[in-house]
Amino acid sequence: MNESRHARLHRATSETDITLALTLDGQGRSDVDSGIGFFDHMLTALAKHGGFDLELKAKGDLHIDGHHTVEDVGIVFGQAFRQAIGDKRGIERFGHALVPLDEALCEAVVDISGRPYLAWNVVFPREKIGTMDTELFEEFFRAFAMSAHIALHLTCKSGTNAHHIAESGFKAVARALKVAVSHDPRSAGAIPSTKGVL
């Protein structure tokens, strides 16, 4: 097991340059700068409600659009999550959360399975929130799930306000991840799988 449950990564391409540090057993502190204001707001909520400490500095080709930056942050965040979780001994593995924000209600279900998958059932009533394209939320969570090697289901059960839907979704994922990475005191450090490996 990675006792510190911490990872620091740097990834540079011709499109983005990203440095990210993640501590799973944190205090919900964050220092985030992606260059996209609303995305920063969502990542801050993810750290706060997941109990993670998150530092992020991303420079991307925002003169084109936000796609490369958002997707690549998802990749690096997923890689850091996978590294920090270590061999998965003693974790709960599964997490589930329903989180409301006024009229919006989102449900997130997580399995730290080693089998990457995203089931996305979220529809936004408008194409942008601030400067961020709402279609990029799916790209972020897909990149995260694929790189973290987790199965993630996110469903919006109700909502009419795009900001509320996005924030409810990020908070639901945060709460589900918080449960999934937590230690099961009855497991005696075992791998949470009948196969003995994840």
Curated annotation (Swiss-Prot):
Molecular function GO labels: imidazoleglycerol-phosphate dehydratase activity
Name of the molecule in the record: Imidazoleglycerol-phosphate dehydratase
Coiled coil: none
UniProt EC number: 4.2.1.19
InterPro entries cross-referenced by the UniProt entry: IGPD_sf, ImidazoleglycerolP_deHydtase, ImidazoleglycerP_deHydtase_CS, Ribosomal_Su5_D2-typ_SF
Reaction equations catalysed: D-erythro-1-(imidazol-4-yl)glycerol 3-phosphate = 3-(imidazol-4-yl)-2-oxopropyl phosphate + H2O
Cell compartment(s), UniProt: Cytoplasm
One GO CC term, this protein: cytoplasm
Family affiliation: Belongs to the imidazoleglycerol-phosphate dehydratase family.
Primary localization class, coarse: cytoplasm
GO biological process, one term: L-histidine biosynthetic process
Pathway involvement of the protein, from the record: Amino-acid biosynthesis; L-histidine biosynthesis; L-histidine from 5-phospho-alpha-D-ribose 1-diphosphate: step 6/9
Domain of life: Bacteria
Classification of source organism: Bacteria, Pseudomonadati, Pseudomonadota, Alphaproteobacteria, Acetobacterales
Keyword annotations of the record: Amino-acid biosynthesis, Cytoplasm, Histidine biosynthesis, Lyase
Pfam family name, one: IGPD
Enzyme type, top EC level: lyase
Signal peptide, first to last residue: none
UniProt keyword Manganese, yes or no: no
